[in-house]
Amino acid sequence: MQEVEKLKLLQSEREALKSRIKVKEQEKKAENHTETVCPECGGRQLVHDYERAELVCQSCGLVIDDDFIDRGPEWRAFDHDQRMKRSRVGAPMTFTIHDKGLSTMIDWRNRDSYGRAISSKNRAQLYRLRKWQRRIRVSNATERNLAFALSELDRMASALGLPRNVRETAAVVYRDAVDKNLIRGRSIEGVAAAALYAACRQCSVPRTLDEIAEVSRVSRKEIGRTYRFISRELGLKLLPTSPIDYVPRFCSGLTLKGEVQSRAVEILRQAGERELTSGRGPTGVAAAAIYISSILGGERRTQREVAEVAGVTEVTIRNRYKELAEKLDIEIIL
C-alpha cells in the first residue's frame, strides 16, 4: 500500500510540474507575442530597421518598437577586410576541419605581438612547440583519417567550384560514415568522393559521377558502388536528379541569356508532366532542351558545343531533341 501511495504522489507531482512548465511557456509566448506578430493587422512580416532602432510591420507600416537593442558590434566596417581586422572573435566552427576549427596554430613568422624578431634561443623553443602542436592536433587514427579525408574533400570541391554548403554537407556525411565504421575495407578517397557526390545531390547542386571521378583519385565504378553503400547504410533520402537542376550551369557554360534558360526550363517542365524524362539521363535531356531553346531564342549553339559542356555525345542530343520536339509539338527550323 505504501508503494502505491508513493507512486500516486510521484504521479501527482509530475502532473503539477507539467502544468507549471506549460504555464511558463504560455507566459513566455505572451511576452514575445509583440515581437513576432503585429498587434494592428496580425502580420508576421516584421522588419528590423537598425539605423532608427525600430521594429516595423511590413504589411501595414506600424512601428511596433522604437527602442530595441542593437546586439551587433560597436565598431563600423565598410568592407570584408575591415570587418576581419576589427573582429575580436575567431573563425566559426566548421565540419570541414578534423577538429572543427577549434584548435589554434603557432605562427611561422618568428615575431612577437609587437612585430619584433624573436631571439635564436626562443626561436628553437618555438620550433619544438610547433612540432609538438602538430602531433597533438592529430592524436589518433580516427583524427588522421579525418584530416586526410577532409583535405581531399576540400581539394575536389575546389576543383569542381562547389559552394560552402556542399562542402559542409559532404564533411558531415563522411563523419557519419566514420562514426558507423563504414570506412573499413574501403579507400578513404572512394568514401570521400562518394560523400561529395551525395552532398551535391542533397544540396541540389548536381554533378555527375564522371565529373566527380575526373577530380578524384578513384574510378567512377568505385565511387558509384561506395555511394550506394553509404546512402543505404546512413539512410540518406536522396531524390532523383532533375534535368532542370543542370540547366543554369550548362547555360552559363554556353554564355546563353536568361530568356533561353527560362525557355529550356519550361520545355523540361512540360516534358516532365508528360513523363518524357523518365528512364533517361538527366544531362542528355537537359542538353537537348537547351539546344532547342537556343535555336528558338536566336542564340543557336551547335550540337557539338552543347555536348562538350554537358558531357554527353552528339548522338544523345540528336535523339533527345527529336523526341522532345515531336512529343511537345515544337517546330524547329534548322
Swiss-Prot record:
Zinc finger regions, TFIIB-type: 34-65
GO cellular component terms, semicolon-separated: transcription preinitiation complex
Keyword line: Metal-binding, Repeat, Transcription, Transcription regulation, Zinc, Zinc-finger
GO molecular function: DNA-binding transcription factor activity; TBP-class protein binding; zinc ion binding
A GO BP entry: transcription preinitiation complex assembly
Source organism, top-level taxon: Archaea
Start and stop residues of the Sequence repeats: 151-234, 245-326
InterPro entries with a match to the protein in the record: Cyclin-like_dom (IPR013763), Cyclin-like_sf (IPR036915), TFIIB (IPR000812), TFIIB_arc (IPR023484), TFIIB_CS (IPR023486), TFIIB_cyclin (IPR013150), Znf_TFIIB (IPR013137)
Residues holding Zn(2+): C38, C41, C57, C60
NCBIfam families named among the record's database cross-references: PRK00423.1 (NF001658)
Physiological role: Stabilizes TBP binding to an archaeal box-A promoter. Also responsible for recruiting RNA polymerase II to the pre-initiation complex (DNA-TBP-TFIIB).
Family classification: Belongs to the TFIIB family.
Protein name: Transcription initiation factor IIB
Organism this protein belongs to: Methanoregula boonei (strain DSM 21154 / JCM 14090 / 6A8)
Lineage: Archaea, Methanobacteriati, Methanobacteriota, Stenosarchaea group, Methanomicrobia
